[in-house]
């Protein structure tokens, strides 16, 4: 089975594969990246983009749900042993992914482009003790990686949570775009 994401959006395709209890590897190519979604009897149990295993399977799925153009192909078989299987149902992943996508799109107006550098100004505008643990983690990622996309990639939670933290840090002048 193969086709175009423009004709069958990824959420609709995954719902179809779930209800028909298909197994295999769904390869999705958006022209820039290649995503793979591993299915067992209609349930997503793993996913990756460009075989980058440092990004969680859930985060990879949520990111692929943003792809509006490209092609897909379902290849039978391809069972893979993984340490970090997705526990959520396919329907649960889709509902949460679409919700996060909507919220992330609303926040994007407040974010710089994904490839933008991020920096920590000196002196700091406030006290680090005023930050939440999650904001401190994001602050550390800005120090370590210095680019929005890398902060999102390395944040242990969702892209939405990381984006909310970056916006909060920027508003309070803990982080700037140089």
Segments and roles (model prediction):
Residues 1-178:
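Acidic, Ser/Thr/Pro-enriched low-complexity segments and adjacent helix/loop capping patches
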